[in-house]
Regions:
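Generic alpha-helical secondary structure signal
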Residues: 7-11, 35, 84, 88-91, ...
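Active-site activation/catalytic loop segments of kinase-like enzymes and analogous catalytic loops
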Residues: 88-125, 140-160
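Soluble or luminal CAZymes and related metallo-dependent hydrolases
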Residues: 28, 32-35, 106-110, 114, ...
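All-alpha amphipathic helical-bundle segments outside canonical DNA-binding/catalytic cores
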Residues: 3, 125-141
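Active-site acidic catalytic loop and adjacent metal/ATP-binding pocket
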Residues: 38-87
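ATP/Mg2+ or Mg2+-diphosphate-binding catalytic cores
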Residues: 24, 31, 146-200
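Amphipathic alpha-helices that form helix-helix packing interfaces
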Residues: 12, 36, 147-150
Length: 200
């Protein structure tokens, strides 16, 4: 897409609308989701960023097959795009990704260590200069994408006669839509630049 951050944001609007128009939506969750949409919508979503490259778009730790003595692989390329590296980095590090399978939310120090290691590993093969201003933007839209997907999924899970249900997935979806989690995303990743000073 010409504007990857805008594209993600628009995808989020459609997913969130499924929940926001649902008569069983939790009012507190709906209000916080609307605040996220409103405030993230005011960010420079159409700005140009770093060099374009192929991105996985759903990068998480489970997609890496690490082999000590032979080649390692990145798998699960269902939705690759030409975008910016910041899109995959944000998805990999965002709390909406790390919390899904591991119940872990990376703190600033852990994210900083990862980003410094990433920049050392790139070692000039690609321009990482745009990360300082693009990564915070992708962090916020990635967080919105995670909670919007959960909002849509909760409505789908509630449909009568749903054939497939997974209690662990449902528990996690509800955790993402809790007032505490949504407020954490809003206060720490939207209203505050979580990455300030750790991305150079």
């Amino acid at each position: 897409p010409a504007s990857p951050a805008r594209s993600i944001y628009e995808e989020c609007l459609a997913m969130a609308d499924c929940y926001l128009t649902w008569d069983r939506a939790d009012p507190a969750a709906a209000q916080l989701l609307e605040a996220l949409i409103r405030e993230i919508g005011q960010l420079p979503l159409d700005g140009r960023g770093g060099p374009r490259c192929m991105v996985n778009t759903e990068l998480n730790s489970g997609n890496f097959l690490i082999n000590e003595e032979t080649r390692s692989y990145l798998v699960d390329w269902e939705k690759p795009l030409i975008s910016e590296a910041a899109q995959d980095l944000a998805h990999f590090l965002a709390p909406t990704t790390t919390f899904w399978k591991t119940d872990t939310i990376l703190d600033r120090e852990a994210v900083g260590r990862f980003l410094h290691a990433y920049q050392r590993a790139v070692n000039g093969r690609s321009d990482t200069g745009a990360l300082a201003h693009r990564l915070p933007l992708f962090f916020t839209v990635t967080c919105l994408r995670g909670v919007s997907w959960c909002a849509m999924a909760l409505r789908e899970y509630d449909e009568p006669g749903r054939a497939l249900t997974n209690p662990d997935t449902l528990r996690k979806i509800r955790a993402y839509l809790s007032e505490d989690f949504l407020r954490h995303i809003l206060e720490n990743y939207v209203r505050r630049d979580f990455l300030r000073g750790i991305v150079s």
